[in-house]
From Swiss-Prot:
UniProt topology in membrane: Lipid-anchor
The protein's name: Outer surface 22 kDa lipoprotein
Gene Ontology CC annotations of this record: cell outer membrane
Location of the protein in the cell: Cell outer membrane
Organism: Borreliella burgdorferi (strain N40)
């Protein structure tokens, strides 16, 4: 049945194919790793991921379907700002941004880092273009019962004039962050509309 070294030849050929397959797989993995490294070192801050678009639209009170999120999100203008002593300066990317401002259909949303219950997170706050009302707010990276209370509130003198329990550090942090976003968005809004 296995005359003239058929089995030996078959095994030799199989071994050669395995070596070639493993070698080509290693080189393709190296190529993929190189591409991932290049892509991760150059984040495209001009595009917003769909998850962030959801947070922004929720803060703005924009009703949309998940299916339409990406196409609607292409119309959101995004601006990144650093801040020092209450003065905001435009920066080119999300890295080191203290405030990110989204503008869509004459409504603003601000995003800023926040620490809630010891967790680092981001808060999104939607603000009407006349800076008289907070539309809604939400968190990314933490959960808090406070989020439901910071919506449909009036703004006066660039801040919310509400009181929170002084013993509740999360409530104080939340209010400070919301007021920081309101003040920041109002200060930089002339730069966005010109």
């Amino acid at each position: 049945m296995y005359k003239n070294g058929f089995f030996k030849n078959y095994l030799s050929l199989l071994l050669i194919f395995l070596v070639i397959a493993c070698t080509s797989k290693d080189s393709s993995n190296e190529y993929v790793e190189e591409q991932e490294a290049e892509n991760s070192s150059k984040p495209d801050d001009s595009k917003i991921d769909e998850h962030t678009i959801g947070h922004v639209f929720h803060a703005m009170g924009v009703v949309h379907s998940k299916k339409d999120r990406k196409s609607l999100g292409e119309n959101i203008k995004v601006f990144y700002f650093s801040e020092e002593d209450g003065h905001f300066q435009t920066i080119p990317s999300k890295e080191n941004a203290k405030l990110i401002v989204y503008f869509y259909d004459n409504v603003y949303a601000g995003e800023a880092p926040i620490s809630i219950s010891g967790k680092e997170a981001f808060i999104f706050v939607g603000i009407t273009s006349d800076f008289k009302k907070i539309i809604n707010s939400n968190l990314h990276g933490a959960k808090s019962d406070l989020i439901g209370t910071f919506k449909d509130l009036n703004i006066k003198n660039s801040k919310l004039e509400i009181t929170v329990d002084e013993n509740n550090s999360d409530a104080k942090t939340f209010l400070e962050s919301v007021n920081y976003i309101i003040d920041g968005v109002e200060k930089i809004s002339p730069m966005l509309t010109n």
